[in-house]
Amino acid sequence: MTGDMNAREYSTRSHARRTPETVAHVMAAAARLGPDGRGRFLAPAALQSWPGIVHGGGLVALLDAAARALGSGDGPRRLEGRLTSSVPIETALDLEGHAERDVATVTILERAQPLTSATVDAGAVEADPAEAVPAEWTAAGREGWPMPLSDQCLACGAHNALGLQLGLRWDRDGVWAHFRPRASWRGPGDRIDPALAPVLLDEVAWWLGALVTKEGGLTNRISVTLLRPDAAVPGPITAVGRFADVTPVDRRRIFWRTRSGLLAADGTLLAVASIVFRPGAEYSTRQMSFFRARTDPENFARMFPGYAG
């Protein structure tokens, strides 16, 4: 989750034309890169987070998809996103990309100024990783409290026909979601779309950072490793992260690093993420009225005690 918002506008439904059926179709149409490394970017409203801007994890997923034109494959890979500036929806922008060996880099530009870039590195991940899953990465036996839903966010928008329509929960230990992805996020053979991991884990990371720092904010560095993108995942999945793993990046505590994972129903680790969250009162000023209006007062006081009065 990244960028700015307006609480009044956030509930406004998109008036854009109906989006295609699957997230793969939408993203392929939004980010078109030619084999010469040049292309165009035009994201529909269905890919937004806060009103008017593209979802942060969605941006990484879009640039991963665009990198296919440069020869980037569908196997295990690491996605490294640098969200320098918010990227507007329904605005024609430029794409530039290049590839060298197993690494492809794609950048979104506005009047030659970079807004966001992502690197797709297939050489950074082994084909059959054996990374251990922390015992605390589970939704089993957890109840917790619900997160507020939005209307049109790609991840948590209750009225976004394309979106995950995600209901995150939290407790004293961390943040999680346990659900079966909708048909628009699935492909043949019970495979989940590769866009799901960056979108979902970015959302988990935002809440991990916000609930540890007790402030609103944004994510600006997104690293997601797709460990088993070709695996069949027929049942529900779990996305989870722990507050204990949220740590300051710098001495001034301006940036905080989060850690989260995506697991199949049998506990198989599908993806891991290391995502940087930047909190601040300037973000809270714009975001808290939205959350307060959509959250039970007692729950809101637990989440953001400094803004509960």
Where are the predicted features?
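Short histidine-centered catalytic/ligand-binding loop motif
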Residues: 46-53, 183-196
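Active-site helix/loop of acyl-thioester processing domains in fatty-acid/polyketide metabolism
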Residues: 53-76, 193-217
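Hydrophobic beta-sheet segments that form the core/acyl-binding groove
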Residues: 74-114, 224-268
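Mixed-charge, glycine-accented linear interaction segment located at domain edges/termini
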Residues: 263, 269-276, 282-286
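Ordered, small/hydrophobic-rich secondary-structure cores
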Residues: 21-105, 109
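A short acidic/small-residue loop/turn micro-motif
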Residues: 122-124, 277-280
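A structural microfeature
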Residues: 114-118, 270-273
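Non-catalytic linker/capping segments at the edges of enzyme domains
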Residues: 1-43, 103, 118-188, 289-309
